[in-house]
Amino acid sequence: MSVQSNKNLSESAQVDQQSIQPFPRSQKIYVQGSRPDIRVPMREISLDVTPTDFGGEINAPVTVYDTSGPYTDPNVTIDVRKGLADVRSAWIEDRGDTEKLPGLTSEFGQRRLNDAELSAMRFAHVRNPRRAKAEHNVSQMHYAKKGIITPEMEYVAIRENMKLAEAREAGLLVEQHAGQSFGAAIPKEITPEFVRSEVARGRAIIPANINHTELEPMIIGRNFLVKINGNIGNSALGSSIEEEVAKLTWGIRWGSDTVMDLSTGKHIHETREWIIRNSPVPIGTVPIYQALEKVNGVAEDLTWELFRDTLIEQAEQGVDYFTIHAGVLLRYVPLTAKRVTGIVSRGGSIMAKWCLAHHKENFLYTHFEEICEIMKAYDVSFSLGDGLRPGSIADANDAAQFGELETLGELTKIAWKHDVQCMIEGPGHVPMHMIKENMDKQLECCDEAPFYTLGPLTTDIAPGYDHITSGIGAAMIGWFGCAMLCYVTPKEHLGLPNKDDVKTGIITYKIAAHAADLAKGHPGAQIRDNALSKARFEFRWEDQFNLGLDPDTARAFHDETLPKESAKVAHFCSMCGPKFCSMKITQEVREYAAEHGLTDEQKAIEAGFAEQSSRFKDGGSVIYKQV
């Protein structure tokens, strides 16, 4: 998306062309649900036929999870000025428990809407918001507890399965390791009823604000695929609305399951409207950031009334989950005094400063039940913030961190009492041997509510490479039971990420999440690995590229040393060359076995050795021969 900053965005905004290019040899497919408007998108990767040297068999296409929304569907016309097509309005209206409001009800929202100076940057198609009718609760958890399977629940069940039954029939899952799930209850098939039961139990959430009707529903929970979040957002130092929308579309192209808008600069309200209207994935925010902007950055001036208005403002726009730092209690703040890095969470430091300035308990904690009333009126999910997370491995697993975690467990039970969906945020910076303690304690304190962690980073010595230091920890905690991993880019601790950094962070975390799914033994997780390994063994280079998480980079790396098209059908790569390719040698052993009627590869190798030995002896046992 490229726009001159002095133009009217509602007239000039353009989609980022890189974000709408279909992936090579891929097509968008839609799996039909029980009603015509349940159409679940997936990406299907077509594969080449196995070369005749290896049997010439047809390889079935591989279906993969797709977060890119309509952006990679060539049959859909994208216009970011109008936003994405509606997905959920009919489902919401059919339930009959919501009402359309005559306009925005938050004071700040009304003020921004009536400010003529903002018209050039305002999203042109602002809709009247929807809210629960009086005495009604519209959360997915509320429906689940009543035994209702919503279209959203059916949608995510279809999405999680990724045509698993068809893949099994096609022979794509001949091999899959059992995995170690550490007590998770992962079924062989995800059904709508299983989704309902997990949401009712609080072990999973479907973040789906009733005002975000463009959303393609997804689920976060330890018994489902591990998800990843990508952060975007402007700051006082730079970035514009159009750049943030471009980051959104770029991030979901590469696999971001949710996106958090962490904007702290100007025009937060307008930026968020553009992002939500163009997002097929859940959008999360940290409302205290905007509340702080409203009091010119003076934390002491924050009030419950101002924060409440901010929650309503964002809920009416369609934010799907709020990070709320309600566990930063006055009594925990002194516990951070001897830390190496103190309080590193922005939200945590804001609330700690407010508590100390007023010598009062955190107003997010004291007004928590009132917050729940707002959340259930719009179906906004809690992401209970870890404001006292460790910012260095020296501070990992200390009294402040775990004290807050225990409080988050108490708040989780209050949220569940109101049938409000809830996940828990976690660290941070934790060395490898201390990671499992974090997961175990979270499961214990928060009764298996989904865990959502930033990494964790496993060492502090690699600025510029913290996507790697954190990717290690993310893979581990995902295996242990973490439901969603917040990505870290190479710019962590150094600056705002650009598009390349966003892609690098997402790919790193897709690797971590997938590695965790494999280790847990998630059904079907190994399909893509098996298909790529088979393509690698059969020297189907294009299939290797296209089955990868990043086909562009894989192809570019291959072409650096073997750029000719003929190299893409060669039976070797540049690492070993044609004479020393282990896979080529293995194939020759198999061919020898077939020619000589041997069914055991080891016997074939031994027979080959014996044959060569006889030739050596028949030649006079001479080491060197005159030629």
UniProtKB/Swiss-Prot annotation:
Its cofactor is [4Fe-4S] cluster. GO terms for biological process: thiamine biosynthetic process; thiamine diphosphate biosynthetic process. InterPro entries: ThiC (IPR037509), ThiC-associated_dom (IPR025747), ThiC/Bza_core_dom (IPR038521), ThiC/BzaA/B (IPR002817). It holds the Pfam family ThiC-associated. GO terms for molecular function: 4 iron, 4 sulfur cluster binding; carbon-carbon lyase activity; zinc ion binding. Keywords: 4Fe-4S, Iron, Iron-sulfur, Lyase, Metal-binding, S-adenosyl-L-methionine, Thiamine biosynthesis, Zinc. Zn(2+) binds at residues 429, 493. Substrate binds at residues 231, 260, 289, 325, 345-347, 386-389, 425, 452. Residues 1-21 are annotated as: Disordered. [4Fe-4S] cluster binds at residues 573, 576, 581. GO terms for cellular component: cytosol. Binds 1 [4Fe-4S] cluster per subunit. The cluster is coordinated with 3 cysteines and an exchangeable S-adenosyl-L-methionine. Gene3D superfamilies: 6.10.250.620, Radical SAM ThiC family, central domain. Pathway: Cofactor biosynthesis; thiamine diphosphate biosynthesis. Its EC number is 4.1.99.17. It is an enzyme of class 4 (lyase). It catalyses: 5-amino-1-(5-phospho-beta-D-ribosyl)imidazole + S-adenosyl-L-methionine = 4-amino-2-methyl-5-(phosphooxymethyl)pyrimidine + CO + 5'-deoxyadenosine + formate + L-methionine + 3 H(+). Homodimer. Catalyzes the synthesis of the hydroxymethylpyrimidine phosphate (HMP-P) moiety of thiamine from aminoimidazole ribotide (AIR) in a radical S-adenosyl-L-methionine (SAM)-dependent reaction. Belongs to the ThiC family. This is Phosphomethylpyrimidine synthase. It comes from Stutzerimonas stutzeri (strain A1501) (Pseudomonas stutzeri).
